[in-house]
Amino acid sequence: MAIITLAYPRSAFPGASPGGGLAALGWSGYLVPAVDGRAVKAVTFSTVTWPHLADVAVPGAEPLEIVRCSVGRIGEESLLQRADEDLAALAAAELAAATGVRGAPVAHRVSRWGGALPQYTVGHLDRVARIRAAVAAQPGLAVCGAAYEGVGIPACIATARAAAVQVTEYLRRGRQWSHG
């Protein structure tokens, strides 16, 4: 997969107020279903989530809106072989079609993450259940991460917290780690 980060002047987005930008529109991002046939699969309006990002503009210049576009579904490896400029132009064109943003981005960055997202296959939930049962039989052991309940940051944080609670409770009961 690749993340294409695009920076636009706030005024490039129709309806965005000079003082409020995309946040004033109530936009945070969107997902694109595979059946739509688009390269971009998800868009996050980063300056809505992290308003301080709008302050990266030159002092006195118009604030920027930072947008992250995710591309690269399973089977789309050839898409990721395109040059950075081509990926940025493609993401910008699809963003314009979806949002009406005007003009080209003033800056962009392409970050590639080959093999970054696990592609769960049929039977994944059953395998996870078996793993969790086997791990539960080993006191003090826990598993977490994108391989289990989801690849998104919230899912990873949730599994990490659950694993931390399991291990902490084990340690609080006064048991020691066993090696062997």
Task: Give, region by region, the residue ranges found by the protein language model.
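FAD-binding beta-loop-beta segment adjacent to the flavin cofactor pocket
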Residues: 40, 51-62, 111-143, 147
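Short, solvent-exposed loop/turn segments at secondary-structure boundaries
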Residues: 79-83, 153-155
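A short pocket-lining beta-strand/turn micro-motif at the edge of beta-sheets
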Residues: 65-67, 104-106, 137-141
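Flavin (FAD/FMN) cofactor-binding core of flavoprotein oxidoreductases
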Residues: 73-76, 88-136
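C-terminal lid/capping helical subdomain adjacent to the catalytic/cofactor pocket in oxidative enzymes
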Residues: 122-180
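Mid-domain catalytic core of redox enzymes
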Residues: 1-67, 72-81, 98, 177-180
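Short, charged, low-complexity patches
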Residues: 84, 88, 157-160
